[in-house]
Amino acid sequence: MDNLSLAKKSIFFKKLSPLDFNAILRCLNIRIKAFKSNEIIEYEGNPAKNAYLVLSGNLRTAFFDVNGTAIPIKDYSHDMFFGLEYIDPNISFYQEELYATEDSIVLIADLNKLFTPCENRCPRHQAIIKECIMELARTSNSSKKRISELGQQKTKDKILKYLSNTISFL
């Protein structure tokens, strides 16, 4: 299956007609790129200019401590967006590294074009903005649930869970 077919089947584009899909690709200046396993996509401190939609494979965000040890934050699998939260103008740089944990195909969208409707306020662009906002809401709810679960765990359980995630990450 070619990369455009993968993108068309994504939750963000499957409601668009083929004509609208091609138009939105041009409107948003979307690119599709393949990344190899362990290839770094964005470094911490890079200007936050793009959002990344996983079409296949898996991406991970991580912090790296002073010893170079990776501390995993979140995995992104099929139909998950990384970078939508950087639409906030107060956050102009990526705060973590993004890399592929396996061979991956990723759709890259310019953040400014993604959230700024085109001059003629086309309905297809409004549909994409709506999907992005829904994705932000899903992410927010998922984070709230995770924080709530962590708040209910004992410190011992948190440490064991963290260590098991770190060991499986290595």
Model-based region annotation:
Residues 38, 49-62, 67, 78-80:
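Glycine- and acidic-residue-biased ligand/ion/polar-headgroup-sensing regions
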